[in-house]
């Protein structure tokens, strides 16, 4: 799916099916997997295939969050211009450098560092749209 379509679906699921009401998580919690998806999605990325180490970008819920890793490392996620209206990724920086992929690898996350999303209120149809910037599919 195009990154713009993924974000729309992710936000629909997050906003409709994860609430603070008694029925806030729909269906079977699936041994914590649905809650894990919600936390990762709130950071702005989530795994579609749990075995390949690829996390596709969505829309961050937080302006800033830190993931504390082993050996004192931290992976910081920042969402600039983040708001209810600004839900579309305009650009991404990984460790201060432009990053054109619409996904990040597990290996990049566990190294520690900084992932910055620059958000806007209209889709950037160019971001992550090129085939080389999309996650590889199983063949």
Each model region followed by its residue ranges:
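Alpha-helical multipass membrane-protein architecture
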Residues: 7-10, 42, 52, 85-90
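Long, well-ordered core segments of solenoidal/helical folds
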Residues: 14-21
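C-terminal substrate/ligand-recognition segments
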Residues: 7, 25-48
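Beta-rich accessory regions
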Residues: 19, 49, 56-139
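A glycine-rich phosphate-binding loop feature that marks nucleotide/adenosyl-phosphate handling sites
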Residues: 14, 28-33, 56-62
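Single conserved hydrophobic/aromatic residue that forms the stacking wall/gate
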Residues: 1-13
């Amino acid at each position: 799916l195009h990154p713009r379509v993924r974000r729309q679906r992710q936000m629909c699921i997050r906003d409709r099916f994860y609430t603070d009401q008694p029925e806030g998580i729909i269906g079977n919690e699936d041994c914590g997997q649905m809650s894990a998806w919600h936390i990762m999605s709130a950071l702005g990325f989530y795994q579609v295939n749990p075995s390949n180490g690829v996390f596709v970008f969505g829309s961050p819920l937080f302006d800033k969050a830190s993931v504390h890793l082993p050996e004192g490392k931290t992976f910081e996620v920042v969402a600039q211009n983040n708001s209810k209206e600004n839900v579309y990724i305009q650009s991404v920086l990984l460790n201060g450098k432009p990053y054109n992929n619409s996904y990040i690898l597990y290996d990049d996350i566990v190294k520690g560092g900084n992932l910055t999303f620059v958000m806007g209120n209209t889709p950037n149809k160019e971001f992550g749209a090129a085939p080389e910037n999309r996650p590889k599919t199983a063949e």
